[in-house]
Structures are given as structure tokens and as C-alpha cells.
A protein has these predicted regions:
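Extracytoplasmic
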Residues: 97-132, 148, 153, 238-242, ...
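Helix-breaking motifs and short loop linkers at transmembrane-helix boundaries and internal kinks
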Residues: 112, 128-129, 152, 160-161, ...
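Structural signature of the two symmetry-related core transmembrane helices
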Residues: 164-178, 403-418
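Central mid-sequence intracellular linker of multi-pass
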Residues: 218-231, 250-329, 495, 500-538
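Extracytoplasmic gate region of multi-pass secondary transporters
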Residues: 117-118, 324-392, 446, 450, ...
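Conserved MFS/SLC helix-loop-helix module at the cytosolic interface between two early adjacent transmembrane helices
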Residues: 148-187
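Cytosolic juxtamembrane N-terminal segment immediately preceding the first transmembrane helix
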Residues: 2-115, 126, 552
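Central cavity-lining transmembrane alpha-helices of secondary-active solute carriers
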Residues: 140-155, 378-390
Length: 558
């Protein structure tokens, strides 16, 4: 049957229609709307709400899962019920088995991409005959390589499965990271930076995709906040480790920063090898020859799978070894309703990036020793963890993304103003340290935006690509940030800080415009939807071929 005519101004042109999965897709569970003052108690509860209660809808999705060869299709059960206590127990098990190891793998990423900051505190630049601009170029080469590897890595991960590709990535980049022990000048420095970028690119969206197999859309932001909390924990641990490793300067005639690269690279290699054994492909594939009992009982497996499907039925419209077609890729690229989130990713992290990368150089320029410099980076990392977890919890509690995420830009604005116009900058040793520490303690909203992008994608194929596109926009912003602090502008970086101030103001404006856009789009959809009769709405739900955010019965989160 065809979709009945929609007499409205709704922009049908450019909508996404997918003919690859057979029958038209029915309505998804995100239809339920939450008010502005919704709390956690209003969140989706798999033991209570069931979008498959309609037998026709359940049968349709059963056919979709069968046609896509979805790996969990044999445990799909529209009639399954479970208690709140059972679900909480399973979430705890998922946090211990899935989320914790995701954090360990992210630790491996951050160790090898972040230890350059500690290395330069040990006179690495002087040892190699490099200056500030060379350091910037190295960071830029890394980010450009990282940027261009994002989408190919995501496509490869979707083809062979993140459980295979992610451990391979970790092992490969750890070998390159260790090889930095042997760099001898600008050429080898840039080469290793490029290789690290190529091999690490796509890791984050790959891991987010894997996490989405186990968690619902309301649970994912908090797990991602744990994920990015690891970034700060890693900074603390590597600062302490650097304190020890940099004392190895002179051992066998080598500089301490060389030992830092070698030893931390080998640590990451161990994480990569372990990941081959600790990353199951899905909830139904935890039993292996080395883990014969698996992670879950048969009932727990059924609950894990069905709670995720009831939150988002489209999570089963592709299997976990299925490549994205060029058609699906193009559909995601032209989904203009996700562009506001990509623009936010491009801009909002720039004001924090230069101070973060230059933290050890700034602190050391204040007269602190190499070892005290690394220890003094710890306070901002500790506070960063607290504010990150707080802002993500706040977003979940109020079911508010835009205004809560905007707290990051509001936090950094007065700090950036002080960087530019405070007369005691650099000259006041402890005042400068306190200012930079407060700035870098900002509430990181990245977890909110990643989960926000995932939710507004509203489709597995779109979600896997949009995660990469969002992360690419963030990396592009980091590339821009690398050219804000320049060698001819130090030590006060007045020109650079003035640019950070302007960008910080722009970030606040973009947050407000993004919220206004999604409110407008939801009202537009609501107007068209309400113009349909009940029969037309039912017909649309069961027969439309529109997918993802293009559906009239989908509402954007904001």
C-alpha cells in the first residue's frame, strides 16, 4: 500500500526512503515524549513499556530481523516480561563486563595519544631540535590523519565487527607508539604522528557503536560519561607514571621521554591483546571456548536483547557483520537535521583545546621543574572528572541536552576573558596556575553530544556513520585549535586568547540556535501529524518507508 497524501508544508523532498530491508518500517519507541521537567523516573522502563504489544507491529519487526539476519533474532520475544530488580541487576553486570572494559580500552587510546604532553615537559623538543610551530604541526598531522581515518574505520568496523576491529586497532597503534622511542628528528616525529592518527581514527565511534548493542538510549550518556572520565583518570595515572619514567633519563644513555613512549606503548599492547578475549560480538555471543558459561543465563540474554529492542527496534535492522552500502552512507551524509550537532562538535571544544595541549609548557614556563609540572596537571584532571559526571547526570535528570551542555561554554568564558585581559597572566605564578586549573576543570559535555547524535539518528545505519561524522567534526575543530597559539605570540598568547574569546561566544550562540532549530522541527512535524486522522496516522505508522529522523512520528531530542 502507498502512504496517503499528506496535505501540509512538510518538506517531503530530500527525505530518506530505504528499499533494502523489504517492508516499510513501523513506528519506533522514541515516539514517547518527555516534558521539560521529566526526571529519571519518567525514563523508558523495559519491564513496563512494550512497542511490540501490537501483534502486527511485532510480526513486522520479526520479519525485518529475519531478513537482516540480525544476530539476536532468535531471542526476540514481544511477550517477554521481567521485573525492575532483574533489569537493574543486568545493568550492573553490563557495567562490570562491558562498560568497564570499554573504559580500559579508552585508557589505551588516551595513553598513546596523550603522552606527548608529558614528553615535551622532558625537553623532547630541544632534544630533537624542534620548536613550538613544529609541535603544532605534529599535532595537526596527527589530527588530520585521525580525521580521514574516522569514516573508513567505522565502515570497516561495521563490516567485520567492532569486536574484531577494535582489538586490532589497539595492537597496531601500540606498536607505533612504542616505536617513538627511536624518533630522531622532525621527519620521524611527523611520521609517527601520522601513523598514530591513521590507526587510532574511528576508535571512539567504533566503541560507541559496540556499547549501543548493550545499552538503551537513556542509559548510554551516563556510560559515555564514564568513558570520558577515563580520559581524566588516564591523565592522572600517566602524570604519576611520567614522574617515574622521566626519571629514567640517562638509563642506557637514552632520554626519559623515550622510555615513556616505549613502556606506555607496551602497556597498551597488553590491553589490545586482552581485548580479543574480552569483547563479545553481542549479548548472544559471550560463550566461547575460553568462556564456556558466557556472561549471562539464557533468561538474562533474552532480557538484554529485548530491552534494547524495545527502546529502539531499529537496532536489529542490520546484523553486526553487515557493511554499510553507499546508499546508506549517502543518506546519512545528506541528513541535514544532524548538521547542527556536527557544527557544535566543530566549534564548542576549541576554547579548551590550546590550554589543554599547552598545559605542561605553560606550567613549566612558570618556573616549575619537569617532575612538578607533571604532578601539577593532576588537580584539573580530578575536578574535570567531577564536573563531567555532574553535568551528564544533570542532563539525564532533567532530560535536557542543549542548556545543560551549554554550561561548558559558560564555564570557560570568564576564564578565557582572564587569559586575555588579566594583567597578572604568566607574571603571577600561582594565579596563572589557578586560572588554567579552573579553566581545564570545565564540565566536558562530549558524552551528552555523542549520545544526543546517536538518539537523533534514530537508525542503526545512520547511527554508525553519524557517530563518525560527529567525531570528525570534533577533530576538525582540534585542527583549527592547533593554529591558535603560535610561536610568535608566546608567552602571553594575547592574539590566540582573543580568538578563543570570540569562539567561546560563538559556541554559546550555536547552542541556543540548535535548541531553537529542533524545537521548530518538532513543531513542524507535530503540525503535520495532527492534521492526519487517526486512521491516516495508523496507516502511516505501519506502511511508511521513511526511516530515521525523517519519520513524521519521530521527535528530535534537544
Amino acid at each position: 500500500m502507498s502512504v496517503p497524501p499528506i496535505q501540509s508544508g512538510y518538506p517531503v523532498a530530500g527525505t530518506v526512503v530505504d528499499d533494502e530491508l523489504g517492508d516499510p518500517l513501523p513506528r519506533k519507541s522514541e515516539i514517547k515524549e518527555f516534558s521539560e521537567d521529566s526526571g529519571p523516573e519518567d525514563a523508558y522502563a523495559g519491564y513496563g513499556e512494550n512497542p511490540f504489544a501490537d501483534e502486527a507491529v511485532a510480526e513486522h519487526w520479526r520479519q525485518v530481523y529475519q531478513e537482516s539476519q540480525y544476530e539476536c533474532r532468535h531471542v526476540f520475544d514481544p511477550t517477554l516480561t521481567w521485573s525492575e530488580e532483574e533489569e537493574k541487576a543486568i545493568i550492573r553486570k553490563l557495567d562490570w563486563r562491558v562498560c568497564l572494559w570499554a573504559c580500559v580500552m579508552f585508557f589505551g587510546l588516551q595513553v598513546d595519544r596523550g603522552n606527548l604532553v608529558q614528553a615535551v615537559s622532558d625537553n623532547m623538543l630541544d632534544d630533537l631540535g624542534l620548536n613550538t610551530n613544529d609541535y603544532n604541526y605534529g599535532n595537526t598531522v596527527f589530527l588530520i590523519s585521525f580525521l580521514f581515518a574516522e569514516l573508513p574505520s567505522q565502515l570497516l568496523s561495521k563490516k567485520i565487527g567492532p569486536d574484531r576491529w577494535i582489538p586490532t586497532q589497539i595492537c597496531l597503534w601500540s606498536i607505533v607508539a612504542s616505536s617513538q622511542f627511536f624518533i630522531s628528528g622532525n621527519g620521524s616525529f611527523l611520521l609517527t604522528r601520522a601513523l598514530l592518527g591513521v590507526l587510532e581514527g574511528g576508535f571512539i565511534p567504533d566503541l560507541v557503536l559496540w556499547l549501543s548493542y548493550f545499552y538503551t538510549s537513556r542509559e548510554l550518556p551516563i556510560r559515555l560519561s564514564y568513558f570520558w572520565t577515563t580520559l581524566s583518570v588516564t591523565t592522572i595515572l600517566t602524570s604519576l607514571l611520567a614522574f617515574a619514567l622521566l626519571h629514567m633519563r640517562g638509563v642506557l644513555g637514552y632520554a626519559g621521554w623515550r622510555w615513556l613512549f616505549l613502556i606506555e606503548g607496551l602497556i597498551t599492547l597488553l590491553v589490545g591483546i586482552a581485548s580479543f578475549f574480552l569483547m563479545p560480538a553481542s549479548a548472544v555471543q559471550t560463550k566461547t571456548w575460553f568462556r564456556p558459561n558466557g556472561w549471562f543465563s539464557d533468561r538474562e540474554v533474552a532480557i538484554v536483547v529485548n530491552r534494547v529492542l524495545r527502546d529502539d527496534p531499529s537496532k536489529g535492522d542490520m546484523h553486526n557483520r553487515q557493511a554499510l552500502t553507499p546508499r546508506r552512507l549517502w543518506q546519512t551524509l545528506k541528513d541535514y537535521d544532524l548538521w547542527p550537532l556536527y557544527i557544535l562538535g566543530l566549534i564548542i571544544f576549541i576554547p579548551q583545546s590550546p590550554p589543554t595541549k599547552y598545559l605542561t609548557l605553560i606550567v613549566k614556563s612558570l618556573g616549575f621543574s619537569t617532575f612538578n609540572t607533571n604532578l601539577l596537571t593532576i588537580p584539573s584532571s580530578v575536578f574535570h572528572i567531577i564536573t563531567l559526571l555532574a553535568i551528564t547526570r544533570l542532563s539525564e535528570y532533567f532530560n535536557e541536552r542543549t542548556l545543560v551542555a551549554m554550561i561548558q561554554a559558560v564555564w570557560t568564558l570568564p576564564c578565557v576573558i582572564a587569559l586575555e585581559w588579566w594583567p597578572g597572566m604568566i607574571d603571577n605564578k600561582w594565579g596563572t596556575f589557578a586560572l588554567v586549573t579552573v579553566l581545564l576543570s570545565y564540565p566536558y559535555c562530549h558524552a551528552i553530544l555523542v549520545a544526543w547524535t546517536s538518539k537523533n539518528s534514530n537508525n542503526v545505519g545512520t547511527r554508525s556513520v553519524s557517530a563518525a561524522l560527529y567525531n570528525m567534526s570534533v577533530q576538525l575543530g582540534n585542527i583549527i585549535a592547533n593554529f591558535i597559539y603560535r610561536d610568535d605570540d608566546k608567552p602571553y598568547y594575547r592574539r590566540g586568547n582573543r580568538n578563543l574569546f570570540i569562539i567561546n561566544l560563538l559556541a554559546i550562540v550555536l547552542f541556543l540556535l540548535t535548541k531553537a532549530y529542533y524545537i521548530w522541527r518538532n513543531k513542524q512535524k507535530e503540525r503535520v501529524w495532527n492534521a492526519l486522522s487517526k486512521e491516516e496516522q495508523d496507516h502511516y505508522i505501519k506502511n511508511t518507508r521513511l526511516q530515521g529522523s525523517r519519520r513524521l512520528d519521530f521527535r528530535f531530542a534537544h
